[in-house]
Structures are given as C-alpha cells and as structure tokens.
Amino acid sequence: MVRARRTKRDSVTNIYRTCKQAGNCPPDVVNKVEQTTIADQILKFGSTGVFFGGLGIGTGRGTGGSTGYVPIGEGPAIRVGGTPSVVRPGILPEAIGPADIIPIDTVNPIDPNASSVVPLTDTGPDLLPGTIETIAEVNPAPDIPRVDTSVVTTSRGSSAVLEVASEPTPPTRTRISRTQYHNPSFQILTESTPSLGESALTDHVVVTSGSGGQPIGGVTPVEIELQELPSRYTFEIEEPTPPRRSSTPLRNITQAVGNLRRSLYNRRLTQQVNVQDPLFLQQPSRLVRFAFDNPVFEEEVTQIFERDVAAVEEPPDRDFLDIAKLSRPLYSETPQGYVRVSRLGNRASIRTRSGATVGAQVHFYTDLSTIDAEESIELSLLGEHSGDATIVQGPVESSFVDLNVQELPQVIEVDPEPTFHSDDLLLDEQNEDFSGSQLVYGSGRRSTTFTVPRFSTPRSDTFYVQDLEGYAVSYPERRNYPEIIYPQPDLPTVIIHTADTSGDFYLHPSLRRRKRKRTYL
C-alpha cells in the first residue's frame, strides 16, 4: 500500500485572507490571527495586574516582532529599500494668558503749525535706549625710580651674574615713656607673692616681661639649679589605673583564692547563712556557746568547740547549732562592691561508734555597710596665712579723720598732749532711761515677784496684781443693766385671718378638731 504524500499547508495569514470572505476558516486559524487563544486571553486579562515589560510573549513567530531582535547596546536595524520612520519632536505647549507689558517711551506731540522740514544737526546719532556708553580712561603709569646696576663680566665659560643692590631700610624710631605716681596711703603687704606687672613695697619695684626680667632694688634673689622635667606628648592620654587587688598578684595566690571561693560558695556542698549579729565580727564564740569574756584572747584564729554530742545544749544563736569548728575570718569583695567577712564552720551532728563525727559545712558571712565620703569643706588657717592670702587693712581702705589736729584745735592750745584720742569714738556709751520702767516688789530669791502697774481710770486709784504673763488692758465698764420685759399670760391670743380669694386657707392649730375616743355599743 502506497502512503499518501502529506502536503504542507499554506501560511495562516494567507489562509485567513482567503477563507474569511467565504466564511469557512478553521477555528485554529481564526484564533491565532484574531488572538483569541487561551494564551492570548491569559495575557490579556493577566496584564491588568502583571507587567512583563516588552518581553515579546505571544502566539506569533519568535522573530521579535516586525523589527526583530536588537542586541543590547546597539541601535535598531535599518532595512535597505525601506522607508525610515520619522520621529517628530514633541511641541511644547504655549502658555495662554496676557502678554508681558513693555514700557514705551513717551513721544512729544507734534504741533500742526510747525514746519515739516527737519533741520540737519552736526551731532552724532543718539544712543539707543538700553545701551550703556563706555568711556575709556587712560591713566599715566607711575614713575618708577631707576636703579643703577653693575654688570660683571668674566672671561670664563660660566654664566653671567647680575648683582642687584637692595634698597636701604629707613631707621625706625622707638620712644618709651614711663610715668610714676607716688601715693603715700597705698601700701602692699610684704607677704604677698609678686606676679607679672605687680609692685611690692614702695621702694621695691619688679619689672618683668613675657620672657624674663631684672629686679631693681631690694635684696638680690638667690639662684638655684633647677631640673628640667620632660614634657608630656600631646597625643598621650592618661587613663585611670584599675584598682589593684593585691600588692603581689601571683598565680599561686590567685589559684588559692579561686579554690577557697569554690569551697565557700558551693551551693550543693556548703550551706549559706547570713549573720546579722555584730558579735560575729569580734566574738563569734559567744554565738556558739555561753562563755565568759576573755579580753586577752583574740578570736582571729580557727576555733574548735569540744563538747559531748549526747548533751543537748541550745546555743545563743540558732544558726550556730552543733558547730564544732569555726575558721578564721576571711575577707572578700561582693559583686556590689561591699566588704564581706566570712567564716567556714563544720557541724558535728552525728557521731559514729568509732568516734568520727559527721556534719555539714556552713558558710557564715556578713556584709559591711558602705562608708559614705563626707563632703570636704574649705578650712581657714588660724594665726598664719600664705603669701597669696587677701588681707584688708582698715587704716588703708577706710577714711579716718584725726580729730586731734583738725576738729579740736582748742584742745591742742590748752594741752599739747591731749588725753582725748579719735579711738575714743569707738566706745559705745550706754544711756540708761527709766521713763518706761515699772516698780517690782519682792523679797528673797525664792519669793514670788509681782509687777504692780498703775493705770489711770475714772474711779479711785486701784492697784492690780498681775500674776500671769502678758499685757494688762484697762477700759471703763458700765453697770447699767437693760430692763427685761416679760409677757403677760392674762391677755387673750388674737388670731388675724386675711381675706384670701384663691380658695386656699391656713387653719390655726387651735381651731383644729380634737380627736375623741368613742365607745361602741
């Protein structure tokens, strides 16, 4: 059997062009040309939410569209014989609105009777408005003095040397003036430290400058040899040194402290007890058992308490029950920075037949409170002062007038050496005035003292004895009592009723009907 030859179908575009008019186009051709396939519908409805950006995804040929694929970095290809597309530039829209107002120079009105002939003038044309006329100014060059120079020539093959003499520098005149005023009332303490520009005594002046000076007058200072200290580099920064734990930080000591810390703070093998009693610091044995004080014995060593286990003894502190051994005090530092005093103790709770004791280890500790640093206050020296201290001299700062010479000349004439001096004005004379005093009567130290004031009253003179502290006030009194009028019960009670047209009334309590008990048969 001979197999039929399969012929190739025409292109979809040609088939659609011929069969569209007849109306017998295959459905695949219509969907492909009109882009109604499932893929086209997915892209059509999915493009509303997803943008693929010109990737060329579609049902057409993979030729990159009508223009083809363009490599990256190159322009579009140009076909020979084709009509190039012209790209027109965008036209900027013009703004709609009134035009700018341009000022126009005013023109003089023309006289109708004037002549129409324009006379000629010899002047040049006027400059247009808006232009700037520039006039060049020529300044003559300044006179430069000539300098005569000498040219030195040699027969050797070296280059020529031109010597130019420099201009002489005019001398500079310096004038230094000094003015001194003598003030006899101004004095300086001999203990004051002279600084730059400060004078000492009236006959001793120190003139110094920034780099040194030479004292004039007074005692010649003694020069001593000074040692120059090396200066600190500018980039060197001084940092605080951390506090040292010990003077000789050896590794063996560190290991011993670590082992002791593990033995003290082992939660599983050592019981932790915080002691608040202050006897734990000085006499811890009084917390274990009752004993007498021995001032000679120092409890800074390990203590062993021997007693019978069968004998039940209650210690002064319940935390130290069955303590058989108490170590010496150990000092450490807590994470909070407090000083902790610790003692490691062993309990003898159980004793075997062989004599061995069994008990737990207990770590007794107490934390010492902090000592707050007191604020430092500035103290002044008594009886002495340094050279930089400030002392106010009364005779120098204050103004005193000698009354012996100026204000009391008659005293000087009578007595050449008067006994009165200006310092006598400083004495405070107390003048006693008894105008507002009171008379006090009393006898003996233990007797009661009464103050008897006298008051002026319209009555006869009367003395009031004041036995209480305070002020006594006297004022006139009246003995006229007001007359009391009592009502008479014989008069009948008058009841006045007013005319009321509103329909309401007020019934007097006396007009109300009394309730009576009735007997029912």
Curated annotation (Swiss-Prot):
Its main location: virion. GO terms for molecular function: DNA binding; structural molecule activity. GO terms for cellular component: host cell; host cell endosome; host cell Golgi apparatus; host cell nucleus; viral capsid. One of its GO terms (biological process) is viral penetration into host nucleus. It is found in: Virion; Host nucleus; Host early endosome; Host Golgi apparatus. Signal peptide: none annotated. Coiled coil: none annotated. A motif (Nuclear localization signal) lies at residues 1-10, 513-520. HAMAP family: PPV_L2. Interacts with major capsid protein L1. Interacts with E2; this interaction inhibits E2 transcriptional activity but not the DNA replication function E2. Interacts with host GADD45GIP1. Interacts with host HSPA8; this interaction is required for L2 nuclear translocation. Interacts with host importins KPNB2 and KPNB3. Forms a complex with importin alpha2-beta1 heterodimers via interaction with the importin alpha2 adapter. Interacts with host DYNLT1; this interaction is essential for virus intracellular transport during entry. This is Minor capsid protein L2.
